């Protein structure tokens, strides 16, 4: 991802090209995956086609994690509803529902071959994961609401935490994740180079 951003000259220009995913301008004609997404005002983001389900999390790689937080909530609210048309696309061996479970908790394994889970934003005010080793992962976001969908501040085990990822070890050792949610994006959090999740490529000199 880092090299892809570099090929686009800068992080800004890389993500200047990404927002059109959320409109219907790309193809110029109707295809079935896009028809249902357009109806939901999601444009070309075909969530029912599993290979795209990591895409929103990529904002975390380019210093704009608040955009991931916004769009992830939009997908959960619009595409997972208890109505006849409330579940987009197909399941593909549990991937679409697994995406929701991870995303509702506030993180997702974008690159399963790494040891990292990329941060989104939780859907609940509190959730607890009881691990097989007897330890717990607790995610607390008491101000969470339909309006308060952005991460203002986050702590991991009592310490301020700005990274846009958790390591597998962080979670498996038991973790307490405390998140202060806000109705405004914090554009100063998670923007340092060391806050970006794993990338196979690194900056080239």
Where do the protein language model's features map onto the residues?
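Beta-rich accessory regions
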Residues: 66, 81, 111-114, 118-205
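Active-site core of glycosidic bond-cleaving carbohydrate-active enzymes
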Residues: 1, 8-138, 143, 169
């Amino acid at each position: 991802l880092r090299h892809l951003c570099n090929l686009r000259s800068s992080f800004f220009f890389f993500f200047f090209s990404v927002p059109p995913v959320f409109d219907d301008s790309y193809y110029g004609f109707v295809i079935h995956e896009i028809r249902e997404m357009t109806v939901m005002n999601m444009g070309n983001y075909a969530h029912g086609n599993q290979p795209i389900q990591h895409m929103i999390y990529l904002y975390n790689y380019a210093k704009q994690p608040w955009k991931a937080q916004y769009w992830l909530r939009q997908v959960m609210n619009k595409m997972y509803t208890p109505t006849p048309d409330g579940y987009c696309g197909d399941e593909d061996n549990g991937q679409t529902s697994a995406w929701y479970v991870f995303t509702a908790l506030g993180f997702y394994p974008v690159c399963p071959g790494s040891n990292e889970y990329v941060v989104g934003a939780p859907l609940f005010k509190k959730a607890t994961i009881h691990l097989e080793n007897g330890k717990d992962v607790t995610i607390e976001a008491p101000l969470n609401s339909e309006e308060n969908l952005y991460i203002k501040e986050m702590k991991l085990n009592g310490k301020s935490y700005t990274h846009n990822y958790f390591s597998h070890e962080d979670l498996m050792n038991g973790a307490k994740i405390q998140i202060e949610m806000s109705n405004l994006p914090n554009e100063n959090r998670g923007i340092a180079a060391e806050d970006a999740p794993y990338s196979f490529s690194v900056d080239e000199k």
